[in-house]
């Protein structure tokens, strides 16, 4: 069982096939990728295991910062998390996180890219909160 910080945060990179996941501690401003998931029961297990104080969801926006179909689906996902887990859910602009994740992980599996994108979303959240 992982050690729990009082303020552990889970972040999600929402996708239609997979959801990238990362865990982090704001006090240390560290984030680490976890295996990607694809179902709410898997998310429930992560929430029970890590007992986060809050959740973060990346919102995919266009280059211009406009919402589109995936933005609305990610927002729906964030609202489902709020309702189901009764935790605060922050939204973070995730433009370019998947591109940066692919750059960091050239040649690795797509599942790893999704969770590294979630790690980048969480790192951005920490930067914005500082």
Regions found by a protein language model. Give the residues of each.
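Phosphate- and other anionic-substrate recognition elements at nucleic-acid/protein interfaces
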Residues: 2-12, 16-130
């Amino acid at each position: 069982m992982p050690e729990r910080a009082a303020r552990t945060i889970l972040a999600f990179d929402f996708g239609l096939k997979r959801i990238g996941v990362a865990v982090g501690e704001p006090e240390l401003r560290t984030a680490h990728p976890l295996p990607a998931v694809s179902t709410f029961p898997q998310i429930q297990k992560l929430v029970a295991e890590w007992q986060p104080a809050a959740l973060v969801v990346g919102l995919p926006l266009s280059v211009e910062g406009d919402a589109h179909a995936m933005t609305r689906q990610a927002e729906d996902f964030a609202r489902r998390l709020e309702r189901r887990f009764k935790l605060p859910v922050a939204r973070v602009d995730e433009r370019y996180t998947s591109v940066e994740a692919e750059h960091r992980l050239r040649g690795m599996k797509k599942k790893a890219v999704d969770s590294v994108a979630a790690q980048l979303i969480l790192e951005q959240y920490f930067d914005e909160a500082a």
